[in-house]
């Protein structure tokens, strides 16, 4: 993901004010001769997506995936024996999390779970407000699959509280089996970077050693 704190990921700091953290980080890279080659989004562009191929592999979920040929950001999984609390424990273990924010009743049984894209405004799909006052957005599509495709739970990347998360909270309070596991963007996709250390040697051979070094959970919990 971006190295220097901006979405366009400029190779330098361009905000017009001094950033001491940027300066110190860059100085360390220069001091130790470290080159940063940001290949994350290129790996997303693989077919199939190289990041989520790795996530699914290292979660051990290949056997549970359904509708694998479905286009778009959503990946579906069906589990024979899964609950909200079991999913919490599994994600914490496999993703090496310090904790997890979730919505749902711990004992509720989950059958169909969807790994979805980032739930942010104006991402993936956006249209201006129509004449009837409706503005289409990706979060609305996620609500649709939970309503129409019997999706019990989602695992998103980035989230905001006022769209899908509020829908799921309301659903749970109304007695429905719905859940969300907010593991965080970096935590969700880091296993995909681990997978990169598997396929890069297949491309370049053994000429250059390849190692996966996890950055760890960005968050702490009390």
Please place each PLM-identified region on the residue numbering.
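Active-site catalytic microenvironments in core metabolic enzymes, especially phosphate/sugar-handling
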Residues: 1-222
